Structure formats: C-alpha cells, structure tokens
Amino acid sequence: MSNYPKSGKPIPQISMFEVESANIEAVGYHPETMTLRIKFKSQNIYYDYFKAPSGFFIEMMKSESKGRFFSTQIKGQFKFEKIEL
C-alpha cells in the first residue's frame, strides 16, 4: 500500500463500482476512513474525498445523474487528494 502524496497517510484499498455516467467511471467508499473515491472517465486518476459520510456514497449510487450529484453535493464540500493507483 502506498501513501497519499500530501499527507503521507496510507491510501486505503477501496472496492470500486462502475456507474452509468458521461463523466464518472467508478465510485467506491471506505467506511472506516470515510473516504469517497471517484474515478473520472477523462483521466487515469482517482480522487479521494475525505470525511464524507456514507450517505453521500449511497445517494450518489442511487442518483439519476452521478455527474450532477457530484457537482452539487460533493465538489467543493470535502478536502480531497488526487492519486494514481
């Protein structure tokens, strides 16, 4: 397991679930660390959003538009780090 570039903390292993979306490829959640991971289709990079309550993952998975949910509910709301896995 590697570490986050900024904080140096270990990067958790997170199971990813492919989603139907024009921009988002997959989403995953690690409940112990409250980390929401999102992989966008346009990049081979993952974004980990920290201290995200599990409800955000559940609601995102249920949402009709994953991209709209991300833009209105997640983007700008949580600290994040870009990682390459």
Q: Which role does the model predict for each range below?
A:
Residues 2-85:
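Acidic/histidine-enriched, beta-strand-rich ligand/metal-binding domains
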